[in-house]
């Protein structure tokens, strides 16, 4: 029901067949992706599968070399990149970091810090924060902007397991409260948010996509997580049965080479043990 | 006899005052720019731009154009050449800087040697001649310097955002590439203005040492910029006074004074809280 309601929501970002080409190879290619207001889209996939590249295209940090990316006019983005390193010589408190790209209301800054659970660190210098604290500070900064689109590249880095669950719950709450769209990257194949509306698996291209409900039925999910974290965690488990070649073509499990992999099909609900020639990233 | 001494004092007063006024003016401009050079880890980059100034000097004499304009254009072109080579070359930035820095300096020296019809005081360009500063030079420093500071104030937020993280800046509409380009132009302008005062070889030290000395007293980027300006001004006053007292060259004396300030800033005073605050626990 919610799903159909969302179809009417304003489109924040729309990518059509988008790809980025660098040093003679495609980092990612043929990406079709839409994020609407109030929708949470999660990208998963192994290292080097083009998740960060896709996200950077979506928000205009990278320009696509083919295909098209369309953003809502005057789209306000809140971005938490994968890695931020700030030189020690730059004196920057958490509070000051909040106003990095725009002046903010003092109250909103306080609320965002509170929501991220680091209100007590408002005056601390960012270089003194632990990895998890800094990640929360970056999240608070993105939240305080009250963005239309919240973009998070592996937001749980350096955060322990309980912190991870709390952080995903927080992101889901924010979506519910503000109605923003969320584009999320998770490198962990076993942990994606139950609140996610769409899961997209990347591996140089879009391998598959679907609702997490489909994924929740998977027997592996029940075996690994049980009912314990059923509201928050889901497992997304499948085998890749094809290999991506350097020129962008695809070698399938039976050895045939095709131009792309949209022709075949992944089944998430079953254990795809038949994928002999693939690069399985199911753990 | 008595009249001559009085006359001498007046003259001394005059050129010394001019040197002080010029040096303090320059320090105020260089402080905030120097902070960005330190934060962005661009010390060697600044050095390269400064070295290219000698090529600018030679070309200005060759084509009989305004010296300041010639130096500005060549320094700006050197920074553009570097940006281009960084994107399209295979050499590391470090190696590129080494090549550009010393080849532009050498080219300048060779060209000056060829132009036997002009007598050029190389030492004045390499190490500065602050005691020969004219009223026109002072007008140039204050006029040009005010313009540089105004543009920097206008550019402050995008440039700081790009310094912290260019991807966040790009995603949130701060246009980091443009900010970086304008910052290069400001650097080139500052080098053109500063050359006569401290000389090509020592400009970078005036950029970096006062900023480094100011770091310990700063809790925000803005305070550090002001602290760097003040530290620079103190170095100018101290260096020039010492140069008059001990008959040492003015440019190097200013740099030595700045170095002493920096070393003093490293001393931990028991009554001053110098360590960055970290009030929070770890996640």
Swiss-Prot record, chain A:
Entry EC no(s): 7.2.2.20
Residues annotated to bind ATP: 45-52
GO cellular component, one term: plasma membrane
Pfam families documented for this protein: ABC_tran
Membrane topology category: Peripheral membrane protein
Summary of the function given for this chain in its UniProt record: Part of the ABC transporter complex ZnuABC involved in zinc import. Responsible for energy coupling to the transport system.
Region (Disordered): 264-283
Biased composition (Gly residues): 272-283
Name of the coding gene: znuC
Lineage start: Bacteria, Pseudomonadati, Pseudomonadota, Alphaproteobacteria, Hyphomicrobiales
Principal EC category: translocase
Originating organism: Chelativorans sp. (strain BNC1)
Superkingdom, taxonomy of origin: Bacteria
Keywords recorded for this protein, A-Z: ATP-binding, Cell inner membrane, Cell membrane, Ion transport, Membrane, Nucleotide-binding, Translocase, Transport, Zinc, Zinc transport
Identification of the protein by name: Zinc import ATP-binding protein ZnuC
Family: Belongs to the ABC transporter superfamily. Zinc importer (TC 3.A.1.15.5) family.
């Amino acid at each position: 029901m919610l799903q159909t309601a969302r179809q009417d929501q304003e489109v924040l970002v729309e990518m059509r067949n988008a790809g980025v080409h660098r040093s003679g190879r495609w980092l990612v290619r043929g990406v079709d992706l839409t994020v609407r207001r109030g929708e949470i889209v999660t990208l998963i996939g192994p290292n080097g599968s083009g998740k960060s590249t896709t996200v950077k295209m979506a928000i205009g940090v990278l320009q696509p070399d083919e295909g098209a990316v369309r953003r809502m006019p005057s789209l306000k983005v809140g971005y938490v990149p994968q890695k931020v390193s700030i030189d020690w010589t730059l004196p920057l408190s958490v509070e000051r970091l909040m106003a990095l790209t725009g002046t903010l209301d003092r109250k909103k800054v306080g609320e965002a810090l509170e929501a991220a659970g680091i209100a007590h660190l408002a005056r601390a210098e960012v270089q003194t924060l632990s990895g998890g604290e800094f990640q929360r500070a970056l999240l608070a900064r993105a939240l305080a902007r009250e963005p239309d689109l919240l973009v998070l590249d592996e937001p749980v880095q350096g955060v322990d397991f309980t912190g991870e669950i709390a952080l995903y719950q927080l992101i889901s709450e924010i979506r519910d409260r503000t109605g923003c769209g969320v584009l999320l990257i998770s490198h962990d194949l076993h942990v994606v948010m139950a609140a996610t509306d769409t899961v997209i698996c990347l591996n140089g291209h879009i391998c598959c996509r679907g609702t997490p409900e489909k994924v929740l039925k998977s027997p592996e999910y029940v075996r690994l997580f049980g009912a314990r974290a059923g509201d928050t965690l889901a497992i997304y488990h499948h085998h890749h049965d094809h290999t991506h070649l350097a020129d962008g073509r695809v070698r399938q499990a039976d050895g045939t080479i095709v131009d792309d992999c949209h022709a075949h099909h992944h089944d998430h609900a079953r254990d795809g043990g038949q994928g002999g020639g693939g690069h399985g990233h199911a753990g | 006899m008595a009249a001559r001494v009085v006359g001498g004092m007046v003259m001394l007063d005059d050129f010394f005052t001019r040197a002080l006024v010029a040096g303090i003016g320059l320090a105020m401009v260089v402080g905030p720019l120097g902070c960005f050079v330190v934060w962005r880890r661009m010390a060697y980059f600044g050095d390269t731009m400064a070295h290219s100034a000698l090529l600018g000097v030679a070309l200005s004499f060759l084509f009989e154009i305004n010296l300041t304009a010639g130096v500005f254009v060549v320094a700006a072109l050197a920074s553009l050449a570097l940006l281009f080579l960084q994107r399209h070359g295979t050499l590391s930035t470090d190696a590129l800087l080494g090549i550009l820095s010393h080849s532009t300096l050498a080219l300048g020296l060779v060209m000056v040697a060829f132009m036997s019809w002009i007598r050029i005081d190389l030492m004045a360009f390499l190490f500065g001649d602050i005691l020969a500063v004219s009223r026109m030079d002072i007008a140039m420093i204050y006029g040009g310097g005010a313009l540089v500071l105004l543009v920097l104030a206008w550019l402050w937020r995008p440039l700081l955002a790009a310094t912290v993280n260019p991807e966040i800046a790009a995603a949130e509409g701060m246009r980091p590439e443009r900010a970086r380009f304008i910052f290069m132009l400001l650097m080139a302008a500052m080098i053109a203005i500063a050359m006569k005062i401290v000389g090509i070889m020592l400009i970078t030290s005036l950029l970096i040492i006062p900023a480094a000395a100011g770091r310990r007293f700063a809790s925000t980027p803005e305070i550090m910029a002001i602290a760097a300006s003040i530290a620079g001004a103190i170095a100018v006053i101290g260096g020039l006074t010492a140069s008059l007292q001990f008959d040492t060259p003015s440019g190097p004396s200013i740099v030595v004074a700045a170095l002493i300030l920096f070393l003093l800033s490293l001393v931990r005073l028991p009554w001053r809280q110098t360590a960055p605050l970290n009030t929070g626990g770890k996640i």
